[in-house]
Amino acid sequence: AEKQTMLEMSLTHEIGEQNLQFKPILAKLYADNKYELMWKDKAAEKQFLREYAAMVASGISKRSAQSLINLHNAEKTGGLTYDVLLSDAFLDYLYYSKNVNQQAQRWLYATNAYKPELPNQEIIDQWQSAVKNDAVSGFVNGLSNHNRLYRETVQSLPSMISASGISEMGKKLALNAQRLRVIPDFENGIFVNIPSYQLKYYRDGKAILESRVIVGKNERRTPVMYSRLSNVVVNPPWNAPTRLINEDILPKLKRDPGYAAAHNYSIL
């Protein structure tokens, strides 16, 4: 404990008091690295910040947003302080990127639901190995999702940012980008865009069929998922679920006895 306290005091001596998420581990990492910069590769820095800014813009974490503000404020000063703040934010992003696939339903469907935590030591060691071997760009690139729709969405975000901040449409787009992040890239498959009520069928990376779809109401949301399909039944027989009958169809039948016939419902 005494050694850790000394390490943290040494880091504070080097960069002053900073609002860090992961000061204990950063104090050790930078001491081990003799306080040399870890972000000498500017291409890796740019790539990381693009991904991190897209994550922050989605609104899933106020703490991550504060880290991005701290980075922006320290950018002009640069040097070791900026480098440590970059690493602090990167540990946040590292934990997020390694766990979002398992936590998507919890983190990406509620405001400020994601709480940054320290990544496991094995992942941190892999990052430090990349730093020592000048391979940070490759390491950062490996954390991203190469889903084409995700990449295109992230690339469109800067156009929605002004001096007053990101637009409401931009925030929605950023959140949808994070939801796309958990979907692997695919050349052949069916992609359903729930907010726009649209389905697209892709073959060899090209959309060859588009169709309107019916989705659930806000109080009965359509599940979000990724799955492999072994077969598709076209125009299957369908019985209305009990909840839909009770909450939607019966009230309409009470108002209009001819509703069922007008909408081709058969009462069994």
Regions found by a protein language model. Name each.
Residues A1-L20, A31, L91-D92, T111-N112, ...:
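Well-ordered beta-sheet/strand-loop patches within structured domains
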Residues A1-N112:
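Cationic-aromatic interfacial patches
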Residues S97-N133, K206, Y226:
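Structured beta-strand-rich cores of soluble
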